[in-house]
UniProtKB/Swiss-Prot annotation:
Disulfide bonds: C290-C306
EC number(s) from the headed UniProt entry: 3.1.1.-
Recorded GO CC terms: extracellular region
Source organism of the structure: Streptomyces coelicolor (strain ATCC BAA-471 / A3(2) / M145)
PROSITE patterns cross-referenced by the UniProt entry: TAT
Cell location: Secreted
Domain of life per record: Bacteria
Protein name stated in the entry: Bis(hydroxyethyl) terephthalate hydrolase
Post-translational modification: Predicted to be exported by the Tat system. The position of the signal peptide cleavage has not been experimentally proven.
Pfam families, alphabetized: PETase
Keywords (A to Z) from UniProt: Disulfide bond, Hydrolase, Secreted, Signal
UniProt signal peptide: 1-48
Single GO term (MF): hydrolase activity
Temperature remarks: Optimum temperature is 25 degrees Celsius.
Length: 310
């Protein structure tokens, strides 16, 4: 009788084949796991295990210079009739709720100006993972000390009564402002040392020394500013901060007092880095602040203390 050579194989003959299949399955499983992990690390909700406040994927030069970050953004208007202590405004916030709460920033306009003058910062910062409130002041003629109080009143409304309060970590807050709003930013940081970040943009204030400020502060001046010249405003503000405070001075090149009123990549880049570093305690952004940025086509000068202590 003719025998079939493909039947009745020896008992151990299948083992190498099975081992090969198992190895291939293990390799595929590992590859899938790697893809899943990579997706987790690079998606909008990526967070490092040792810092629960990190939001968004690892930053790059291009990501912090982009017009929009990884988060989709919505906005809601706040009527001046619905609030006390400031003039209402617009809240910009990430639509995602899967990442937990976000830090928040309130931004005040300058003398005679409205929130529209700094509105570009709202979606730009919010898309990087912040709740941002651009406000109007009670009157356009309000002075820096009044604007400082209004920034704090807006923060209190944002965290206590606003429709997005559940999206905010009330322990991670910052302030920004332009011109007299920038002077108000320093006033707010002086009054409330629990603030995590302050960014005065081409600031104006009659008070030149700020020894009481312990909040990490980035002062932004402009080399062509004739309304608040850096020699009598931004530079002494920076120098008047305690050396123990995390501080930096960024002087824009070929810029004016009104440069913060239109979309500006340099302002956005370093504001995002400062807010991320100190509100989110996200050291992934330290690389853009330390070593100190060098003079360039957009930077006239940059000073600061590195590495940062906070």
């Amino acid at each position: 009788m003719q025998q079939n050579p493909h039947t009745h194989a020896a008992p151990g003959a299948a083992r190498p084949v099975l081992r090969g299949v198992r190895r291939r399955l293990a390799a595929v499983t590992a590859a899938v796991a790697a893809v899943l992990v990579l997706g987790t690390l690079t998606g909008p909700g990526a967070q490092a295990a040792d810092n629960p406040y990190e939001r968004g994927p690892a930053p790059t030069e291009s990501s912090i210079e982009a017009l929009r970050g990884p988060y989709s953004v919505a906005d809601t208007s706040v009527s001046s009739l619905a609030v006390t202590g400031f003039g209402g405004g617009t809240i910009y916030y990430p639509t995602s709720t899967s990442d937990g709460t976000f830090g928040a920033v309130v931004i005040a306009p300058g003398f005679t100006a409205y929130q529209s003058s700094i509105a570009w910062l709202g979606p730009r910062l919010a898309s990087q993972g912040f709740v941002v409130f651009t406000i109007d002041t009670n009157t356009t003629l309000d002075q820096p000390d009044s604007r400082g109080r209004q920034l704090l009143a807006a923060l209190d409304y944002l965290t206590g009564r606003s429709s997005v309060r559940g999206r905010i970590d009330s322990g991670r807050l910052g302030v920004m402002g332009h011109s007299m709003g920038g002077g108000g930013t320093l006033e707010a940081a002086k009054s409330r040392p629990s603030l995590q970040a302050a960014i005065p943009l081409t600031p104006w204030n009659l008070d030149k020394s700020w020894p009481e400020v312990s909040t990490p502060t980035l002062v932004v001046g402009a080399d062509g500013d004739t309304i608040a010249p850096v020699a009598s405003h931004a530079e002494p503000f920076y120098s008047g901060l305690p050396s123990s405070t995390d501080r930096a001075y960024l002087e824009l090149n070929n810029a004016t007092h009104f440069s913060p009123n239109t979309s500006n990549t340099t302002i956005a880049k370093y504001s995002i880095s400062w807010l991320k570093r100190f509100i989110d305690d996200d050291t992934r952004y330290e690389q853009f602040l330390c070593p100190l940025p060098r003079p360039s086509l957009t930077i006239e000068e940059y000073r600061g203390n590195c590495p940062h202590g906070s």
